[in-house]
Regions:
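N-terminal intrinsically disordered, cationic/polar leader segments
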Residues: 1-55, 62-66, 105-124, 128-137
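Solvent-exposed interaction patches of small proteins and small membrane subunits
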Residues: 46-53, 69-73, 95-100
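Conserved interaction-surface patches within small, structured recognition/assembly domains
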Residues: 61-75, 86-90
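Short Cys/His-based metal-binding microdomains
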Residues: 77-81
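Glycine-rich phosphate/pyrophosphate-binding loops
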Residues: 91-108
Length: 137
């Protein structure tokens, strides 16, 4: 399994293949289209991530001391972002998530791609992932 750093580098290299912001958006949309199916029973307010322009649901599941997530959004860009975040931080020990260097995500240069509202949404998703990790430590 790749480390968090290796996963972030993978997404950086993938995004760097595109010169145009629209192509990067298409990459995010492709991530959303390839996401796992979200169980409908979790589509409720208790799993909704506040602070996102779109509706985003993030559900933790702990199995064999590995934290992973069910996730979904009603908007492709947001769903693409939550897909990437859950791929980077999912299937890991909660302590590994808590102790990771979240500033490494800055290498993805999302601040130049996303609108301020979407950046806030990504921040909210990341905070929810941290919150879930902390709750299982």
């Amino acid at each position: 399994m790749k480390t968090i750093e290796e996963k972030i580098n993978y997404y950086k290299e993938s995004l760097d293949l595109f010169d145009d912001g629209m192509d990067k958006y298409k990459f995010l949309i492709d991530q959303a289209k390839n996401a796992k199916i979200f169980p409908e029973e979790y589509r409720n307010d208790s799993f909704k991530v506040s602070g996102c322009q779109a509706q985003v649901w993030l559900v933790p599941k702990l199995k064999e001391n590995k934290l992973s997530f069910y996730y979904d959004s009603d908007a492709f860009i947001s769903k693409g972002m939550v897909t990437i975040l859950c791929d980077i931080y999912g299937d890991r020990n909660p302590s590994e998530i808590k102790n990771s260097d979240f500033s490494m995500l800055n290498t993805l240069e999302l601040d130049t791609l996303l609108t301020p509202g979407r950046r806030n949404g990504v921040y909210s998703m990341l905070e929810k992932i941290k919150e879930y990790a902390n709750s299982y430590i």
